[in-house]
Regions:
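The feature marks short-to-medium sequence segments in extracytoplasmic or secretory-pathway proteins
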Residues: 47-89
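Terminal connector regions
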Residues: 104-144
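Short Pro-Gly-centered flexible turn/kink motifs
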Residues: 88-102
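Structural beta-strand segments of beta-rich domains
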Residues: 28-32
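Sec-dependent signal peptide recognition
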Residues: 1-7
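Low-complexity, acidic Ser/Thr/Pro/Gly-rich terminal tails and inter-domain linkers that flank the onset
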Residues: 7-26
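Asparagine-centered strand-capping/turn motif at beta-strand->loop junctions
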Residues: 34-41
Length: 144
């Protein structure tokens, strides 16, 4: 069953990768970089909401420090239905990348090992594809 899951994820038209510096100081910004890649044969319209492509306007991440949840402290946007301006086109074989500073939306002022998973998955309009973004880990060190 695990092989089937991995195969399904590998064949998804929209691939999501997340990255941050693996070690940083608590007094430094920490950009979360999201890279979306269209592995499909046709273009995809990707909704920017709940992603670094838009910035922080929703609680879209599960973040823990030493297995304790870190609450979201950023702005919350009240939304209706998305309009055409809320999507961007990602052509077949194309990749797009955006980043947003995690320290603007989450309290990362304590040293320790953090785990981040993306709860709100990027959405696509044309194929209904919602990729799984990988879980990532990083360490915050005391201020220098």
């Amino acid at each position: 069953m695990m092989t089937l899951l991995l195969t399904t994820l590998a064949l998804a038209p929209l691939q999501c990768d997340l990255s941050v510096k693996t070690q940083s100081r608590v007094n430094e910004p920490l950009p979360l970089v999201m890279t979306l890649t269209n592995r499909g044969e046709g273009p995809l319209e990707v909704l920017s909401w709940f992603t670094p492509f838009e910035g922080w306007f929703a609680d879209a991440i599960d973040l823990t420090l030493d297995d304790r949840p870190i609450p979201y402290k950023g702005p919350l946007a009240k939304r209706g239905n998305p309009g055409a301006e809320d999507f961007f086109l990602l052509g077949a074989g194309q990749q797009s990348q955006a980043d947003a500073d995690l320290t603007l939306a989450y309290d990362l002022s304590r040293p320790g090992r953090y785990q981040l998973s993306y709860r709100a998955q990027p959405l696509t309009l044309t194929r209904g594809v919602a990729p799984r973004c990988p879980v990532i880990h990083f360490t915050r060190l005391p201020a220098s």
